[in-house]
From Swiss-Prot:
Record keyword NADP present: no
SUPFAM superfamilies: YebC-like
Name under which the protein is recorded: Probable transcriptional regulatory protein Desal_2886
NCBIfam families: PRK00110.1, PRK12378.1, YebC/PmpR family DNA-binding transcriptional regulator
HAMAP family for this protein: Transcrip_reg_TACO1
Gene3D superfamilies linked to this entry: 1.10.10.200, 3.30.70.980
GO cellular component: cytosol
Native source organism of the sequence: Maridesulfovibrio salexigens (strain ATCC 14822 / DSM 2638 / NCIMB 8403 / VKM B-1763)
Length: 248
């Protein structure tokens, strides 16, 4: 979909900010704990394999990874957290999905509602905006290293749905249930992705002007400052001039 690469760049920028704020290991540990509830062997649990891969990509120490796995399987205390999804609206009527991992849902919902309200948005009812997004496996490749045809040839046989070209990136999309096999196909072909994750991809993007986009970015950052918030997804088409500022 046109404009999605800008959305992906927002995700990448957020990851850098998480690392700067020292929050990245906390978020990764929660991902691993939740994934390990489905089994502690990454060879048999694709979700855990993905969570471990993401943790290693940000240099999370092996002992912290092992501890998180044991919390998820129940071998250690501290794994009593659950996944929650909140839906709402941001500045300009942009749809917002907030993924959280929490041991206290009442606390988290109150804090997310407060952040949304203070940032010019509002909390919505369950289902109000989720239909505007599709959960997809998304792998992002450098367009200078690979061609669209090359990625299609490798990916389609493994279950990839599409390759989307925009700017300097090529994105391979697939259904979540095919994600593990698609990843394996590219690894076997020695095609290295810049990023690889399950994400809520907007079906359509809403254009916003620069002032609205900046308000939205501030709101997203406030939400992500919450220790319980794992990911924030929006359906905004961020202006090119704002993206240029972010790269400076």
């Amino acid at each position: 979909m046109a404009g999605h690469s800008k959305w992906a760049n927002i995700q990448h920028r957020k990851g850098r900010q998480d690392a700067k704020r020292g929050k990245i290991f906390t978020k990764m540990a929660k991902d691993i704990i939740l994934a390990a509830k489905g089994g502690g062997d990454p060879a048999m649990n694709p979700s855990l394999r993905l969570a471990i891969s993401k943790a290693k990509a940000v240099n999370m120490p092996n002992d912290k990874i092992d501890t998180a796995i044991k919390k998820g399987t129940g071998e250690l205390a501290g794994g009593d957290i659950s996944e929650v999804m909140y839906e709402g609206y941001g500045p300009g009527g942009v749809a917002i999905l907030v993924e959280a991992a929490t041991d206290n849902k009442n606390r988290t919902v109150a804090e997310v509602r407060h952040a949304l309200g203070k940032g010019g948005g509002s909390m919505g009812e369950a289902g109000c905006v989720a239909w505007m997004f599709d959960k997809k496996g998304v792998m992002v490749f450098d367009a200078e290293k690979y061609t669209e045809d090359q990625l299609l040839e490798i990916g389609l046989e493994a279950g990839a749905e599409d390759v989307i070209a925009e700017d300097e990136s090529l994105e391979v999309h697939c259904m979540p249930e095919d994600f593990s096999e698609v990843q394996k196909a590219f690894e076997a072909a020695e095609c290295e992705a810049k990023s690889s994750d399950l994400a809520f991809v907007p079906k359509n993007l809403v254009e916003v002007d620069v002032p609205t986009a900046k308000k939205l970015m501030n709101l997203m950052e406030k939400l992500e400052d919450n220790d319980d918030v794992q990911n924030v997804h929006v359906n905004a088409d961020f202006p090119d001039e704002l993206m240029a500022e972010m790269e400076d």
